């Protein structure tokens, strides 16, 4: 497939293995990625992970601020196929209609489940027991195009958004490379999505990062691990946001209101829920580093926490 002219559109680290494999196996004409960002107090310019790979391999980089208004440079390259993965903007019809083999998207869910920008987080938060990768044709909708191929992974109880991210990134490469030849020679499957089965995974809002203990232990467990390692779940104690990075479900039940801190020992910070309690195993105080429960106990007094209530 070395003569296959490809434009790749993507932004985060999830896409890096895909781009690296495409560079090895095809002729990548250009990479389209999100504009550079200023980060930190010094407002230093940060390149996307995909841009870094493109620069390393001397590949043309395009970074439209609004792709629906700035697509002529992309079309002028006359690609055979455009492959996207977590690009970050809605791709206009002018681009979708450009390549002879179409625009193909690598989406991190088993469509039509979890359409949208945060399928990895929401798969865990919403309690799914499996998810996967879907290779699909793009259309003008949000992840609504015809499906070509899928690969499935199980979501384990010890998975976090980070570990599931890595699992899905790893299986996306062989799935795409297995599927590409059939797309080129026209023998690929093409299955329409059933909109009645669709669920949505919109980007995580600030409100969704907040842990309300007025939920079941399982829901809180899923929320905390589904936001680890980015952006992180938090709860409010004494007016301060405390990051909660990991917990386990505890079978003990109490009469105290949900969110009440029952105990602090080597097993964790025990907090009541609507149907029992959870043990917080890893947390982070404002301005401090992430701590496991052992380090937290060494630097904090039990009496300062027990009896208080998370908001």
Protein language model annotation of sequence segments:
Residues 221-311:
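C-terminal active-site/capping subdomain that shapes the small-molecule cofactor and substrate pocket
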Residues 1-231, 276-279, 285, 297, ...:
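One-carbon transfer enzymes
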């Amino acid at each position: 497939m070395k003569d296959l002219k490809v434009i790749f559109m993507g932004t985060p680290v999830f896409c890096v293995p895909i781009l690296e494999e495409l560079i090895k196996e095809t002729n990548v004409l250009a990479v389209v990625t999100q504009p550079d960002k200023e980060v930190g107090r010094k407002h230093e310019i940060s390149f996307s992970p995909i841009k870094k790979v493109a620069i390393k391999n001397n590949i043309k980089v395009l970074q439209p601020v609004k792709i629906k208004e700035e697509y002529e440079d992309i079309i002028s390259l006359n690609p055979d196929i455009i492959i996207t993965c977590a690009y970050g903007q809605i791709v206009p019809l002018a681009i979708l209609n450009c390549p002879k083999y179409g625009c193909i998207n690598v989406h991190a869910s088993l469509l039509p489940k979890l359409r949208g920008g945060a399928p990895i987080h929401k798969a865990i938060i919403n309690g799914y027991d499996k998810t996967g990768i879907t290779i699909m044709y793009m259309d003008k909708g949000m992840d609504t195009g015809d499906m070509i191929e899928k690969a499935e992974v199980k979501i384990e109880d010890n998975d976090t958004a980070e570990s599931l991210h890595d699992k899905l990134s790893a299986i996306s490469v062989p799935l795409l490379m297995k599927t590409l030849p059939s797309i080129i020679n026209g023998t690929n499957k093409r299955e329409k999505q059933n909109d009645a089965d669709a669920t949505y995974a919109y980007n995580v809002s600030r409100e969704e990062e907040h842990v309300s203990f007025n939920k079941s232990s399982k829901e809180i467990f899923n929320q905390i691990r589904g936001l680890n390692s980015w952006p992180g779940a938090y709860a409010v104690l004494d007016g301060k946001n405390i990051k909660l990075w990991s917990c386990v479900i505890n079978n003990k039940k109490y009469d105290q209101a949900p969110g009440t801190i029952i105990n602090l020992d080597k097993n964790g910070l025990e907090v009541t829920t609507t149907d029992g309690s959870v043990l917080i195993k890893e947390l982070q105080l404002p301005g401090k580093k992430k701590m496991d429960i052992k380090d937290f106990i060494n630097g904090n007094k039990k009496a300062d926490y027990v009896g208080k209530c998370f908001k």
